[in-house]
Amino acid sequence: MIAHSPSAPFPKLSPEEYLQWEERQREKHEYFDGQIYAMGGGSKNHSVISVRLSTLFCNHLDGGDCEIGNSDLKIQIVNTQNYTCPDVSVTCDPRDRKSTQFITYPCLVVEVLSPSTEAYDRGGKFRLYAHNPMLQDYLLVSSTSVEIDLYHKNDDGDWLILNYQASDRLELKSIGLSFAVDVIYRGLAF
């Protein structure tokens, strides 16, 4: 058994050890090149936004072949042994049904931004996801203002960044869904 105290660094683990260890943890951790990184808790807005997006996706995709995951569902970064914990993910790829611990081929990944993770979500984490041939949409949703950035991969394989704000309508081509931005932020205080 691997023990960890808050003051000690996480031990370096193999991917298999990480997945076994992570199943027994209360908190979520991402895994990158043998290192474990604790994922902090989110704000009330963060939680509400994640639930609303998950519900929206579930209602839209109900009865189909796609699966929607919350932050408990890890993504294995394609062609690596690294794992992330996005706030919401959608996969429609049958290869992802083989694992009970993670998916590898999402078509949509959502990160609800926190001040402490925003730079990583926009930079390093996007670069990890961008190499996935199945990923079409990467949605970055602010939890401190009404603003959403959609990174959409076009037919040429180029990533376009589209910004949405209050009263805009957002389209996720990856799952064939269009919705009003205001639906996600209704009643939230900033």
Curated annotation (Swiss-Prot):
This is Uncharacterized protein slr1290. Disulfide bonds: none annotated. PANTHER family: GLR1098 PROTEIN, RESTRICTION ENDONUCLEASE DOMAIN-CONTAINING PROTEIN-RELATED. Gene3D superfamilies: tt1808, chain A. To Synechocystis PCC 6803 sll1609 and slr1290. InterPro entries: Nuclease_put_TT1808, Restrct_endonuc-II-like, Uma2.
